[in-house]
């Protein structure tokens, strides 16, 4: 398959089952909603070392939020319920409770076959030292916690569902600037898709990895088959003209969400085309042996 001169490899991205949740963060204005959201989703690029993968999903108008203030929605994913629950509570306490004027609400209440309620502000209420009060409104419990700027308002729980993490594709280009330009175009397109995040810096990862290493202490190491500087000394996957490879990783609330995002991102990269140095689109997998979700590139782009 060739799109605008760009070869789409006959391969697939291999992804894994995860647990995911959404939190709606509001504040007096968007500046402070983003401050809380960026702090809460910081150091959350990969579950390998960060515990969770998290990112800002989208901006919300006052008409879309529970308290009628501007806000943003964030998504968080982990490999287990226990890790997600702990990370959510820790990040809420350190990043949202602390942020001036910020409030937090459940982002998943319906629309999925199996929703588990997990703590959002249930335990944070104890920061109020006995002065906190609760209110049940439309079947939901909220907590009002006194803080120095007034009150911290938080919903007691949010929803957790079975999700998918690790959808991905690789952009192979003739130069680093061209690869980065294609990634930026892809991320701009994918950022408009709901229910997904691209958790790496700016949505892009340059240090793609393979399983294993010559060093026993490492479980993963550089993906030498896709490193352009190693073409002459390793079993390379790169043709001579490829001088830069970058990867976009996608986490989504459902399998179809990731497919929609991958299609949008790949299409945007291919729009730049071969004339702008974009030569191939590929994907990372483990031979289909580890992850139950297989996102076939040509099937997605058909």
Curated annotation (Swiss-Prot):
Pathway(s) served: One-carbon metabolism; formaldehyde degradation; formate from formaldehyde (H(4)MPT route): step 4/5
Keywords per UniProt: Acyltransferase, Cytoplasm, One-carbon metabolism, Transferase
Gene Ontology terms for molecular function: formylmethanofuran-tetrahydromethanopterin N-formyltransferase activity
GO BP: formaldehyde catabolic process; one-carbon metabolic process
Main localization of the protein described in the UniProt heading: cytoplasm
Chemical reaction(s) catalysed: N-formylmethanofuran + 5,6,7,8-tetrahydromethanopterin + H(+) = N(5)-formyl-5,6,7,8-tetrahydromethanopterin + methanofuran
E.C. number(s) listed in UniProt: 2.3.1.101
HAMAP family: FTR
Subunit structure: Homotetramer.
Family the UniProt entry places it in: Belongs to the FTR family.
UniProt protein name: Formylmethanofuran--tetrahydromethanopterin formyltransferase
Source species of the chain: Methylobacillus flagellatus (strain ATCC 51484 / DSM 6875 / VKM B-1610 / KT)
């Amino acid at each position: 398959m060739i799109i605008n001169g760009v070869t789409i490899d006959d391969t697939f991205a291999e992804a894994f089952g995860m647990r995911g949740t959404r939190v709606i963060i509001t504040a007096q204005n968007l500046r402070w909603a983003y401050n809380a959201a960026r702090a809460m989703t910081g150091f959350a690029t990969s579950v390998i070392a960060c515990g969770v993968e998290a990112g800002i999903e989208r901006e919300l108008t006052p008409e879309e939020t529970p308290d009628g203030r501007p806000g943003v929605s964030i998504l968080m994913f982990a490999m287990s319920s226990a890790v997600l629950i702990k990370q959510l509570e820790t990040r809420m306490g350190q990043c949202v409770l602390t942020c001036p004027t910020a409030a937090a609400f459940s982002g998943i209440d319906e629309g999925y076959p199996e929703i588990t309620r997990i703590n959002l502000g249930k335990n944070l209420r104890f920061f109020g030292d006995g002065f906190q009060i609760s209110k049940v409104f439309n079947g939901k419990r909220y907590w009002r916690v006194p803080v120095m700027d007034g009150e911290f308002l938080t919903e007691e729980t949010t929803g957790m569902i079975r999700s998918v993490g690790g959808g991905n594709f690789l952009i192979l280009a003739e130069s680093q600037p061209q690869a980065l330009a294609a990634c930026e175009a892809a991320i701009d397109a994918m950022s408009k898709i709901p229910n997904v995040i691209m958790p790496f810096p700016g949505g892009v990862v340059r240090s793609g990895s393979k399983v294993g290493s010559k060093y026993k202490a490492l479980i993963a190491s550089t993906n030498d088959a896709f490193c352009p500087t190693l073409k002459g000394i390793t079993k390379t996957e790169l043709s001579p003209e490829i001088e830069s490879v970058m990867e976009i990783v996608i986490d989504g609330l459902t399998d179809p969400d990731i497919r929609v995002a991958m299609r949008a991102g790949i299409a945007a990269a291919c729009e730049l085309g071969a004339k702008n140095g974009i030569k191939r689109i590929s994907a990372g997998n483990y031979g289909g042996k580890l992850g139950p979700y297989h996102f076939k590139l040509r099937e997605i782009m058909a």
